[in-house]
Amino acid sequence: MNHKLPQHIAVVMDGNGRWAESRGLPRVEGHKAGLDSVKKIINCCLEKKISCLSLFAFSSENWSRPVTEVNFLMELFLEALRKEIDDLNQHGIRLKFTGDREPLSQVLQKQMSDAEALTKNNQQLILNVVVNYGGKWDIVTAARKLIRTVLDGKLAYDEINEAVFAQFLDTKGMPEPDLFIRTSGELRISNFFLWQLAYTELYFTDVHWPDFNEHEFELALISFSKRARRFGQISQSE
């Protein structure tokens, strides 16, 4: 493709359960199938030299799902991390994890920290896995940290601006997404990156995540290439 490409893509991988149910399978089978799509999209990003891919793996609201499904998701996440980390590292992928880790198991937390440490110097792609995250949580937590910094005398009140505030978010140091993709026909962002998506181009598709392949990814990129990103300004034609 010769058209412009996004440098940071954020994805809500929706529809695993619906994909499975439509085939008469348990919902957990959809989550397993969804891992194949993750691998495909990671490879696409590497081929197209996209800098950052954020995957919304588990939201803070997902704890309300059946306990058996939540437990399966956590085990699947841990198993996938253990199995794929060496391959990700060999391909120059840097792993980052965004979200509140405290409620996660100690075993999973350690695996996440070890993966970050192992891949910290890799530069081919930042793979940001978003786990136990909510946009409102991120903003409130950032506000608390900011207030504490001001009270400690490390920052003056009149020094606070958008750039300063962003440094207190859990995504600090990462570029804001250029393209947001959500699968499975849901037309909302569901408390994901509320601050970070301010000027992001949104792309929605009816395709369930396990069916989101290289072709579907290409369609999203083509759609992005046709957008005129104005960042609140008017276009030259206007």
UniProtKB/Swiss-Prot annotation:
Task: Provide a Gene Ontology MF annotation, just one.
Answer: ditrans,polycis-undecaprenyl-diphosphate synthase [(2E,6E)-farnesyl-diphosphate specific] activity
What Pfam families does the database record attribute to this sequence? Answer: Prenyltransf
* Its EC number(s): 2.5.1.31
**Which cysteines are disulphide-bonded?**
none
Indicate which residues the UniProt annotation says bind substrate: 15-19, 27, 31, 59-61, 63, 65, 182, 188-190
Family named by the database record: Belongs to the UPP synthase family.
Assembly, in brief, is:
Homodimer.
Its recorded name reads Ditrans,polycis-undecaprenyl-diphosphate synthase ((2E,6E)-farnesyl-diphosphate specific)
